[in-house]
């Protein structure tokens, strides 16, 4: 069992393979956090609780000053209940902001897990166990359930909560987090993934905690290019390989909040959940509301160990089993080749060139139903002038060539110049007669079932008979004036996301193919999207030098198989030149494809591309199933280096990228990581055979990698040998 309960002491001890999470029910029926960290024996650790009562701290008993909720760690912290730290839940009953006192009532432990209403979540597995803690506010008949689902083999605990109004009057929720976690002490650095459009997650922000509140989040109606739902706490001396690291990530794709606060006593509180800016959710009698799920992991093997825990969990328990460990398509996308001028003739020409390059899937991007950004979204009607046989006929021709076929959609949007908008101007998110516009489009009001069903049916009708293998789902603007003609204002953002998830579910059931999501590049790169699509377009920035930073940061929280990386023209966003080999080595960190006009390249070029496609297929098992070890950070050096290592340690691949000419790259010695110390490995470049222990301690000379000194990007494979 992963979940232990000491009935006499009322202590819960959640164990994974390498971590322990311990909390208890206090003498006053509050749920008190005690410990999270390296795995420990099942001892009574109540002694760590702070029973000191400080001046102005309220305490439970008039006769005793032994317990104050302001002094101890808590699993949930209601507002106005004696805890003066940032609350994790705020609600009022019948318009009164009452004292939100919550008491433990009962718990249950069981194999498996429950789904979360309308929300993505970690999937059920044979090893999964769940603990439910039920608390109540008896004065108002309000019930809150805390969920802890354990994935022991990957050192992950998934947390969420559910609030139910058991009373007779309305309950208004002003703040609902997914988890609250308290630590005694503040000796932490906080790490987040920051960025912007064309530079998502490229800035790894790390700072020491100080007294006060640190907040990371989004209010844009999506997880955003600027901030990511991942956050980590680590010791000051933690690096890639050594030290304690706690990682957290929210399975959600809209507005979120991550708050880290340090109290006057120097204790640390982390809360993650729905952003409460403008949030106001009403529960009528008998109704309930579930929070999104947070996954959390602990590692004492540095940030690299934390990342590998996340990678394993996402691949094993979030991405659909059908795709998680299966070869992915090598695609050619029409956008960089044709933009809005794409035609049936041009896409068939692109397909012919693709056959010469080892590509197996042709993706028709934006332009199949319109010639610019001004119109077409929402109507989804094929431009028969440019596609005379329709998408159905085109897909059949692509299949006849021995290729697979994919198509681009943006189902959540509508153009003002569309039949749909003219017929239903009230079907958009807006609070104004003159709504703000972005990219010549509005966001459809998916809080309304009739809108969700209409879009699902319109797309289904248009794609009827198409021989479809792949769908790219885009989302190209932020939400502004987010209001609805039918939905309460304070519920808009969350109901909108629930509607989007519903639309995903409908279309995935009707089109059981591989989905790849996108949002102006990586604006919705989160675990909520990975529940529906096994890979995400990482960024619209296809400059390989910039992609090094983007992909490196993304790898902190997301597995290689989720990071969509393509070989590109190389200079389309920055003008910087790069060699083919450098571009391939950058793109081979994740799932592979091409973003360029193949007709512009020679037969020799296409032969080179085919070689890259074949190399990718040969090494794809490392991307789908292997472990990632980061060796050199591009933020700290002029280089980037990482290793992909098979789970059985029988194969490894080193990639080294030179971002700036330094003149001493050939003199560098690089220590490898992740190998089996006792196994011998052959360097396929030099033929040299050395033991893993030697390669990880002595290292290799980088100059031995250099074949073409102008490349600046090198990879070498190390198979284990007898």
Regions from the PLM with identified roles:
Residues 388-390, 422-424, 428-581, 591, ...:
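Active-site neighborhood of glycoside hydrolase catalytic domains
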Residues 660-722:
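C-terminal beta-sandwich/jelly-roll accessory domains of carbohydrate-active enzymes
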Residues 18, 161, 286, 332, ...:
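Conserved, mostly hydrophobic/aromatic
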Residues 71-73, 78-112, 242-255, 298-322, ...:
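Glycine-rich, aromatic-flanked loop segments that form ligand/cofactor-binding clefts
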Residues 5, 10-17, 31-261, 277, ...:
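Polysaccharide-binding surfaces and accessory modules of carbohydrate-active proteins
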Residues 99-106, 281-300, 712-719:
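Short Pro-Gly-centered flexible turn/kink motifs
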Residues 323-460, 464-466, 470, 478-481:
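Aromatic-lined carbohydrate-binding/catalytic grooves of carbohydrate-active enzymes
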Residues 231, 240, 633-677:
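Carbohydrate-binding surface patches
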